[in-house]
């Protein structure tokens, strides 16, 4: 039987890799005509361990192979990453195009000349940052599909920006932060200040507009979300409107739990044993992603809030981007002693396992989309504290559009030139967390309901399973 091979080109960052690999596994499990998923792994300078992550995540899946690309000799200057991360990433991918082109051409040539007993390349699945590779797809006569690791809301912004650029050909400025925008994928008007911080930078804004423009050239767009969690935006994209077909295939999650060499086995067991001893829904989990670093004064305010509330907690503190600092070092003197027995402070926490535990009752999160979907899957309500990328938009959508989260902040920014200098006070944090942990808060009931809906979406006959099967039918056509 003639079988298909699909080539994936992800952005080699943790959040993008996790959902990309899980989606590849789902395709292999859904249709036996797909026999191979080939992942082309670029060597991103600020994510040097991507290959190791890929290897561990795919070790048990023989249908996935990794092709590691060599380092490029002239990467973009690292200082560009601090001022315009979107531009850095697009420039990095552009510099990888010659190697990507040669690798894809070789894979297609090899499959075409191998006869009927081997798999044949059926198409490209590209991270949304990799839209420039659509040109390579055309060159080798393959359809290109975009995989949105984020949600419909962010796709709606990418659809909106090129139209805005035609009317107002410049980036947003600080004075437009309070401006409320009509973005067709949203029910409510969207404050400019919750858009990705890059829209306020000339280079980043241009990069986001370029991505939005090129999305039109894709054969289709796969979105890591599900119709029932973003119904208005999903309906908007289902209407076509001279746009590629959009497939809601989420939630695409790695729920096996993830280990980290920084957390010894004994520490993990101790943490889970402590959770086992706590009452149901009584523990607050605070975790801000792999890049979520707060200044010391803000850590002090969070600590004071936890003492004001008096609730049980697990708090993952990163003191630097490497995550190798002492999490207790920036804490107020005596905090660890005063909260002994009712709180755990660590540098890394097994997020999936904690959210899955019945003792966990609330999640203070940076609102990365993977984290949001994990919290919905396990029915744990979120208090929003966005940090970077599109997290401010995710926070706005969860609080204002969907009523699925409690607001600490919607527009907090922790990177680039728009970093938030204001310190969020202990009182403000405590007020939001008390609301979050209130068993009568209607947000909690809605989130628990979405947990059931999310599981149905990816179950047999669920909306996302049907959408994924439709995608498979479209990309394979009548050739397999």
Curated annotation (Swiss-Prot):
InterPro entries: UDP-glycosyltransf_plant (IPR050481), UDP_glucos_trans (IPR002213), UDP_glycos_trans_CS (IPR035595). Disulfide bonds: none annotated. GO terms for biological process: abscisic acid homeostasis; abscisic acid metabolic process; drought recovery; positive regulation of seed germination. The keyword Glycosyltransferase applies. GO terms for cellular component: cytosol. Belongs to the UDP-glycosyltransferase family. This is UDP-glycosyltransferase 71C5. It comes from Arabidopsis thaliana (Mouse-ear cress).
């Amino acid at each position: 039987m003639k079988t298909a091979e699909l080539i994936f080109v992800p952005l080699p960052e943790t959040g993008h890799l996790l959902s990309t690999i899980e989606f590849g596994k789902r395709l292999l499990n859904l249709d036996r005509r797909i026999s191979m998923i080939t992942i082309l792994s670029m060597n991103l300078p600020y994510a040097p361990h991507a290959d190791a992550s890929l290897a561990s995540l795919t070790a048990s899946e023989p249908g996935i192979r990794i092709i590691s690309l060599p380092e490029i000799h002239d990467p973009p200057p690292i200082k560009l990453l601090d001022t315009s991360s979107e531009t850095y990433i697009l420039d990095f991918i552009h510099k990888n195009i010659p190697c990507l082109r040669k690798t894809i051409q070789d894979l297609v040539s090899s499959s075409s000349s191998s006869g009927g007993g081997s798999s044949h390349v059926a198409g490209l699945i590209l991270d949304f940052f990799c839209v420039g590779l659509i040109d390579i797809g055309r060159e080798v006569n393959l359809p290109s599909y975009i995989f949105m690791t984020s949600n419909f809301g962010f796709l709606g912004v990418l659809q909106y920006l090129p139209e805005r650029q035609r009317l107002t050909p410049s980036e947003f400025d600080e004075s437009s932060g309070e401006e409320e925008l009509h973005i067709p994928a949203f029910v409510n008007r969207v404050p400019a200040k919750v858009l990705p911080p890059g829209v306020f930078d000339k280079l980043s804004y241009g990069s986001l507009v370029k991505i939005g423009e090129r999305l039109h050239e894709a054969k289709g767009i796969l979105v890591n979300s599900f119709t029932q969690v973003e119904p208005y935006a999903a309906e908007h994209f289902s209407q076509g409107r001279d746009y590629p077909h959009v497939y809601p295939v989420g939630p695409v999650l790695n729920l096996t739990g993830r280990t980290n060499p920084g957390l010894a086995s004994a520490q993990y067991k101790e943490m889970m044993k402590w959770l086992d001893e706590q009452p149901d829904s009584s523990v607050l989990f605070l975790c801000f992603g792999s890049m979520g670093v707060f200044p010391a004064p803000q850590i002090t305010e969070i600590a004071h809030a936890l003492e004001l509330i008096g609730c049980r907690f697990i708090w993952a503190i990163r003191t630097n981007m490497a995550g190798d600092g002492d999490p207790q070092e920036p804490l107020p003197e005596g905090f660890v002693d005063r909260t002994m027995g009712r709180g755990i402070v660590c540098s890394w926490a097994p997020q999936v396992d904690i959210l899955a535990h019945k003792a966990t009752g609330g999640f203070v999160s940076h609102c990365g989309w993977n984290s949001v979907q994990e919290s919905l899957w396990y029915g744990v309500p979120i208090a929003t504290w966005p940090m970077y990328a599109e997290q401010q938009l995710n926070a706005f959508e969860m609080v204002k559009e969907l009523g699925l989260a409690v607001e600490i902040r919607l527009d907090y920014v922790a990177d680039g030139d728009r970093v938030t200098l204001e310190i969020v006070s202990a009182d403000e944090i405590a007020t939001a967390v008390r609301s979050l942990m209130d068993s009568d808060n209607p947000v909690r009931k809605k989130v628990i309901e979405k947990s059931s809906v999310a599981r149905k979406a990816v179950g047999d006959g669920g909306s996302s399973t049907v959408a994924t099967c439709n995608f498979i039918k479209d990309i394979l056509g009548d050739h397999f």
